[in-house]
Amino acid sequence: AASDVYKRQDYLHLTSNETINGVQLREFNKIEHDSLLIDMSSDIGSYSFEWDNLAYVYAGAQKNMGIPGVSICIGDEKYLNSEDNSRYLNLGQLVEKNSLLNTPPIFSIYVLKLVTDWMIAMGGINHFEEKSIRQSSRLYEQLESYGDFVIIPVSDYSKSRSNIIFKFKNEDLEKKFLIEATEKGILGLNGHRSQGGIRISLYNSITDEMVDYLSEYIDRFFTDNGK
């Protein structure tokens, strides 16, 4: 069985939120492996999780925690050093040098500090998890009510809260949806170039007011186009 194969490995690497297809994994403690490495670049800071079987978590800051140029690494000390890794890939060396193996991206680090201060002031992880659940649930329920027009190609148990993916059954209607959204100042709804469709990204900076505006547009569009 596949599970027996990965249990025998030294570690198991996962991406917690797959942004192209809108698939998310949050309950890491249900995976039967005691050394998980998780890339959380697109959903770090948006929900709480158990750390019992995690060896390392890392994330680029640019989606939820700041701007490009800096990554966040959180891990167990016993996984830091490896003789097989080049110096720039050896996290133990990075820790030993206080993240100063090279000239650090000062502004990116400063923005990360501002964002984390803001997150704490807003109520911390609990606030952003509640917001993520509220916003994503609202939009999924709304889109499911327009099942005559759109398809959500993700199983309920693996739907991403960060990236809502759906496709129109009518390609011309999809193009019209994107054009009119842009005219109303709603940008970045195009799906990944390899998949097409629509992608709604609900990162930590997205407010309820933004979701309200998008939701109103969705209702108005489908009312004007057949429902």
Regions found by a protein language model. Give the residues of each.
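Short, small-residue-biased leader/transition segments that mark boundaries at the very start
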Residues: 1-6
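Catalytic PLP-binding core of fold-type I/II PLP enzymes
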Residues: 23-52
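A short linear hydrophobic-aromatic micro-motif
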Residues: 149-153, 185-191
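Conserved PLP-binding catalytic core of the aspartate aminotransferase-like
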Residues: 150-180
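Short amphipathic alpha-helices in soluble, non-transmembrane regions
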Residues: 176-183, 213-219
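PLP-dependent enzyme catalytic core of the Aspartate aminotransferase-like
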Residues: 192, 196-227
